[in-house]
Curated annotation (Swiss-Prot):
Annotated localization: Cell inner membrane
Membrane topology: Single-pass membrane protein
Protein name: ATP synthase subunit b
Transmembrane segments: 7-27
The keyword Membrane belongs to this UniProt entry's keyword annotation: yes
Gene: atpF
Domain of life: Bacteria
Species assigned in the record: Shewanella baltica (strain OS185)
Amino acid sequence: MNFNATLIGQTVAFIIFVWFCMKFVWPPLMNAIEERQKRIADGLADADRAVKDLELAQAKATDQLKEAKVTANEIIEQANKRKAQIVEEAKTEADAERAKIIAQGKAEIEAERNRVKEDLRKQVATLAIMGAEKILERSIDPAAHSDIVNKLVAEI
């Protein structure tokens, strides 16, 4: 093999070219590739985080929905209990009012009955005196009449 100056020149030129590329061309290319790899990795990591965040948000929303349903059921249950309590109180008040009205009615009936009895006694006494007057065929003065009526009422 013949080594001539052209081959040595080409070898030196190639070595300088490789050194130049390694010194000035290769580092920016490697930086660009590394930056792109980093951006892609960051994008994938962000996508994974977004998926995890979405899953957490969905789980949280599901939990909140369940909690809201439980709370709504509790509120409905409390409302039904309150409704039953109000109805029971109304029934109790109505029963008390009914008993009061019945007692008041009975008292009024008893008072009216006593008044009617008293009137009837007076009428019976008056009739008895009138009958006695007719029998005796004489008239009694009003003071004596009143006295006799009172005595008869007391006896009856």
